[in-house]
C-alpha cells in the first residue's frame, strides 16, 4: 500500500492519478476536506481508502500499521499559503506533522518522500540545496527550511529512503481549490475569460513590467520526479524540482493569450505589502537532481501552459 498525504490537493491528486495510470489502486489518501470542493480532485481516482488528517495522525501516534505493508509515504500535505502569518499554525501543519511522519517511517524503514519548497531560498539569488543559500521571506518558507535542516541531521543514520523536493512554481490541472495561491496561469485565464484582458505586476527589483522571472514547472513533470524516486528507494537527499530554466511572467501571459487566440495584456502597480517579500527571480540548480540519476525532460512554459489550457477547456 502507498499513502499519499495531501492526496486531494494539487500535487497530491496528480500523483494519485499517475499511480492509477500505473495500475496502482492500493492507495490510502490522507487529507483535510474542510474545503469540500477538493473532493473533485479525487472523485475520478481509484483508491483503497481515505482518512482525515487528524485521524491519520492519531493512528500514526499509536503505531498503527494500517493493516497492510506500507510501501512508501508520499507526504504532500501542508499549508502552502505563503501569505499565512499564523506561525503556530504553520509550524504545526508543516514542521511538526512532517517530523511525526518522518520518524514513523524511519522506525519501520518505510521510504518517505516529502514536499519542500523553493520558498526556502527566499530573496537569495543562488538556488542550490545548501543551508547558506536559505533565506526564507515568510513563515511558510521558514517552516519548510527548518524541516529540511532536521532531515539533514537524521539522514546520516537513516536506514531507509528520505527524499525532499523543493518545488519551484508549479502549475497545472487540479489546482482550482487553491484560490489566491493557484498559479499565475490559472488566474490569468480566469481574468481573460471574465474581462478579455490579463494583468501582470509592473516592474520591481530592477525588472521591467512583467519581466520578473520564475522557474515555472508543469505539475506532470513534478509527478515524474516523485515517481522516479519511488522507483529508486536507494536514493535519498534534498533536491530542487524545477526546470532549471527561468522564464518571465510575460511568457506565461503570452502563452495564455495564444491558447485563447487573443486578449489584451495590462500592467498594474506592484502591491506595497509584497515589497521586500517577493521572489523576483528563481531558477532551480538541477546539478544534484541530475547527479542522483533523474534524466527526465521538462516542458517549457509555452508547452506546459498550452497543455494546461487544453485541460481546463475540457474539464
Curated annotation (Swiss-Prot):
Record SUPFAM superfamilies: NAD(P)-binding Rossmann-fold domains
Binding site for substrate: 169, 180, 187, 201-204, 214, 278
Keyword NADP: yes
Domain notes for this protein: Contains a large N-terminal NADP-binding domain, and a smaller C-terminal substrate-binding domain.
Family: Belongs to the NAD(P)-dependent epimerase/dehydratase family. HldD subfamily.
The enzyme's E.C. designation: 5.1.3.20
The entry's keywords: Carbohydrate metabolism, Isomerase, NADP
Cofactor note: Binds 1 NADP(+) per subunit.
Catalytic activity: ADP-D-glycero-beta-D-manno-heptose = ADP-L-glycero-beta-D-manno-heptose
Primary role: Catalyzes the interconversion between ADP-D-glycero-beta-D-manno-heptose and ADP-L-glycero-beta-D-manno-heptose via an epimerization at carbon 6 of the heptose.
Alphabetical list of Pfam families matching this protein: Epimerase
UniProt cross-references to InterPro entries, sorted A to Z: Epimerase_deHydtase, Heptose_epim, NAD(P)-bd_dom_sf
Binding site for NADP(+): 10-11, 31-32, 38, 53, 76-80, 93, 144, 170, 178
GO MF terms held by the record: ADP-glyceromanno-heptose 6-epimerase activity; NADP binding
Gene: hldD
Protein name: ADP-L-glycero-D-manno-heptose-6-epimerase
Active site location: 140, 178
Names of the cofactor(s): NADP(+)
Pathway field: Nucleotide-sugar biosynthesis; ADP-L-glycero-beta-D-manno-heptose biosynthesis; ADP-L-glycero-beta-D-manno-heptose from D-glycero-beta-D-manno-heptose 7-phosphate: step 4/4
Enzyme class: isomerase
Keyword field contains Nucleotide-binding: no
Organism, scientific name: Syntrophotalea carbinolica (strain DSM 2380 / NBRC 103641 / GraBd1) (Pelobacter carbinolicus)
Quaternary organization: Homopentamer.
Gene Ontology BP annotations: ADP-L-glycero-beta-D-manno-heptose biosynthetic process; carbohydrate metabolic process
